[in-house]
Regions:
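Charged, solvent-exposed interaction patches on well-folded alpha/beta domains
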Residues: 1-162
Length: 162
């Protein structure tokens, strides 16, 4: 009771930047909080776009089922050193499935839903290490993970191996 005031400040760490269907931008953190965008600072995190339907920025918490799935997949990416370095964008398709855009390579990853998420990422990591390192990062247009136990790739139409 000596008149001292103690303040504890905890900075929220964003794991993704969301741009919803209506163009509203905000960050999300691991605790399912929405964080307003700052005009003075940008955090390097994956950008999430696509069919994210919600109203205006009126709630500070993630509440819709689509956003809960976004949180699940972006939390996994954020906490995995390999995928955090690889994934640049996460897009939500109209049916709620995910399409991942990597930083390296000129392909998209049709991830599907978050069911068996860890297994899908594990198989994709093996494919990156044992497949793409031999065939090249630009051979495929699409890598599809939404088939149980399989990775299906579509070659680029005009791909020519050097």
């Amino acid at each position: 009771a000596n008149g001292d005031l103690h303040i504890k400040i905890v900075q929220k760490q964003p794991i993704a930047r969301v741009i919803n269907k209506y163009g509203v931008n905000y960050y999300i953190n691991e605790n399912a909080n929405k964080i307003p965008i700052s005009s003075k600072f940008t955090t390097r995190v994956p950008v999430v776009t696509g069919n994210i339907q919600e109203g205006t920025y009126n709630s500070n918490m993630i509440e819709t089922p689509v956003l809960k799935n976004v949180l699940t997949i972006t939390r996994f990416i954020h906490n995995n050193t390999f995928w955090n370095a690889q994934i640049e964008q996460v897009s939500v398709a109209d049916n709620g499935s995910f399409v991942l855009i990597p930083k390296l390579g000129d392909h998209k990853i049709e991830f599907g839903g978050i069911d068996n998420m860890e297994e899908k990422f594990h198989k994709l990591e093996i494919f990156y290490a044992e497949g793409l390192s031999y065939t090249g990062w630009d051979k495929y247009e699409t890598i599809k993970l939404d088939y149980k136990g399989q990775i299906v790739c579509e070659k680029k139409i005009n791909y020519e191996q050097e």
